[in-house]
Amino acid sequence: MQVTLAGKVAVVTGAASGIGLAIVKQYLASGIAGLVAVDLAPNMPTSLTELSQDKRMHYVGGDVGTDDTAKRFTETAITHFGKIDILVNNAGINVVKPLHLHTPEEWDLVMNTNVKAMYFSGRHILPIMMKQKSGVILNTGSISGETGIPTQGAYGPSKGAVHEMTRQLAIEYAPYGIRVNAIGCGTIDTPLVTRSAIDSGNPQAFMAMLKDNHPIGRIASAEEVASFFTYMASDLASFFTGAVLMMDGGYSAK
């Protein structure tokens, strides 16, 4: 079975590292016709520069928690490629604290990046997909959106909102041929996790703890997750919509 995205155009947020970067690479390798990579830095991050010679990819820098950024990445996709088939709402941020220790600014940062960004991207891209009578929206969810985890005071509620918005959008826009799904990730081997391990003071013990939390006995690679995002964006997944698909090594089954 060959998964192909030939002829399709995608917008991927949080594209400069971790899951997002792996998605960008796999979408390009899967024959996508055009891709707009979005991240916070105003200029293209070095992680993406090696891909910049591929004329199928364009970069937009900005805060996804603002309407202006969503407007700009939508316009970039339409200007260069004429359509948008796939939207990946992947940008996310976590403040690792109990709820009572979050400042109002930290709460807003998490909610704006993880939740409000989905409103802004949908506000601009959904009308295009509705006119096309087709489209796929994939949202990066989390085990924190399905079960309580200590120190996820804002992040957990934000991912719960991502999961519920996925269901809402799926029902609302199914008549227009638009599929909406979320991938509920467990712990993924990304630079963020590596930094957290270093900050813990005992990286080996920290990583061992993360692995032990997953019944499968390990954490996932960003490439594994990107492979599933590629399948879910393809026509092979045409009957999936409204699903929160847990890719968590058995974590949520405990």
What is the predicted function of each stretch?
Residues 97-100, 147-153, 175-176, 217, ...:
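Active-site loop immediately N-terminal to the catalytic Tyr-X3-Lys motif
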Residues 122, 158, 166:
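Active-site helix of classical SDR
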Residues 98-99, 103-108, 210:
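Substrate-binding pocket helix/loop in short-chain dehydrogenase/reductase
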Residues 142:
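Residue(s) in the substrate-gating loop at a strand-loop-helix junction
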Residues 119, 218-247, 252:
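C-terminal substrate-recognition "lid" of short-chain dehydrogenase/reductases
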